[in-house]
Amino acid sequence: MHGVIAEEWDREVGEGCGWQRRWEVALSTSFERADSEVVTVAVAPEMVGSTAAIVVLSGCQIITSNCGDSRVVLCRGTETIALTVDQKPDRQDELMRIESEGGRVINWNGARVFGVLAMSRAIGDRYLRPWVIPVPEVTFTTRTDDDECLIIASDGLWDVMSNEEAGQVARRLLIRRRRRALMGEVDDGVSPAQAVADNLTAIAIGRNSCDNISVIVVDLKPKRKSPSNA
């Protein structure tokens, strides 16, 4: 996906529209390309599908693009801010879109498209077209000095942990690891961000999460040199 996005961005640079619009087009086209490539999978291509949450970081912007119920959360100071909105079949606008196409949302262990899929957008899952679509939602957030980290995770984490709890865990562990690193006390080769991701994953497993658990944490604070390296 990274290479596809880079190609689409390079293609959009020469189009002459505003930078936000270029990103929207580049990301949407990238998701469409990824969706098209799913049909090349040898085994049951119509049944293969995935969510996706993409983050592009610049010096002043956080750009997100998501399809499905993987989520991007920003820890900013003491706040925890969801930068994406899960695309669920019972979300009012998604429900209206599905029903306008002749689809149905059935409650079967939660709201599901035709009682099958618990998300309303995805890459793949072509057997549920045109109700489940690979069209991402794109957001733009201006960075601030208070930004601590991003948590990018699949629903295996969010099913058992709220945004606020995940943010609290991340802040607490980041502060502790950074302080220890600054004092030269951490020598396990694990970055503060990786330590947070590992910890969140362990919590989800400990709570018997039943879904895929994929967690990425991005440290948004500039690296500080330890006293020995100053």
Give residue ranges: language-model regions.
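PP2C/PPM-type serine/threonine phosphatase catalytic domain
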Residues: M1-A230
